[in-house]
């Protein structure tokens, strides 16, 4: 409730007034809630009068910061509003209804890292923005100066708002139908960099301690959506996450990517050997071996030759209407052709696979990294890493191996992946998965 003196000044007296408020930046949700391992915080935001009166503002109004913002906007009309805050009220999908109401002219602002503030965890951008609420402009894109912790200007960055006119990447990937039996599983977390860490590919679905399905493995990967999911996966990981782009949104792309086979196949190879591709033969059949038994010098036949058939164009589409209105399948109908960069990744991976089967698969020997390591003829890259690196007492995979040859081969693979990522990155902006 506004004090009477303050209310009188605002309503009657033409004096300039500067008001300093330190609103609580408490959110109803947190990381555990996002991953479905926790619940919304009780009574953080849904017990206030502001919350009750502004249900039309969507999920954003759950946050006390947004409640302060909208109350100032409505009760002190025409004021100049300046604030330090996260960027979500400018670009997050949950704040689309909020931005339909909050109309103002952006005057000036800058971005700095969150870790320059006391008692703030994480590395993400904090924006200082000044708004003239007497001019009602729709927020479309805002340019900020970016400063580091030493007050050094790094660049100018544009923050784009999604206001229903520009969709995020989520409706794009979910329109591809998963027809047939599952080959693996993946997920679709919130479409910004901060949520990339939850994205992975696995051989089986994973469940949380409470029995609910983990979001990271809720979607089937089948022949009909494999290539789009690998593109989605690559798009989200190719561009390195930093504190500056932590809240940037991945978007529904233009259609130009559909005809770019090199881009599609580059993403296919990149996703196949990325560290977050955690397909393991221990969880089920490994359908994603891109090499023949002869190439790897092993005698035992693989359980699945799906990926080889897919790459050779031997998988037939079971339905033409894969893309809905586009009526186009992304199952190859002829052998996939790869760029030099992608071929280099495949060759580096092949050398690593050969070394694994040579060392771990030597019949008649008891070669092991530790007691929990076993030879898997159908091993995926994740299994190979586990074999050579082992796990610590907490069950986490060690970051290094004592095997120097393995380390050399793995580094070769990582380096070729980095070069491939550099080739993919410009296309991500060209096809508008991200905006510069």
Model-predicted segments: where are they?
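Conserved S-adenosyl-L-methionine
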Residues: 106-117
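Alpha-helical scaffold elements adjacent to nucleotide-binding pockets in ATP/GTP-utilizing enzyme cores
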Residues: 68-71, 94-102, 124-130
